Amino acid sequence: MNTKTLIVVFLVCLLVSEVVLARRCGGGRKIKIKKIVRKLRPIVRVMKVITRMRTRRPRPRPCNSS
């Protein structure tokens, strides 16, 4: 699997677990979800920077051993 997809899957799992915990504990569920989204924003920014770096620099062609 791609590293980017693994990160996304991991973040989704974290979100789901936090939402389940918020439901069990009751109370301000929306507030907890907002806090989770705030925590994830820097990670999303880092992923965007990585994708920009990859698209800007073309990958060198593999060397032919023939």
From Swiss-Prot:
Keyword line: Disulfide bond, Secreted, Signal
Gene Ontology annotations for the cellular component aspect, listed alphabetically: extracellular region
Primary localisation category: secreted
PTMs per UniProt: Contains 1 disulfide bond.
Tissue localization of expression: Expressed by the venom gland.
Location(s) in or outside the cell: Secreted
Signal peptide start-end: 1-22
Name of this chain's protein: Venom protein 27.1
Source organism: Lychas mucronatus (Chinese swimming scorpion)
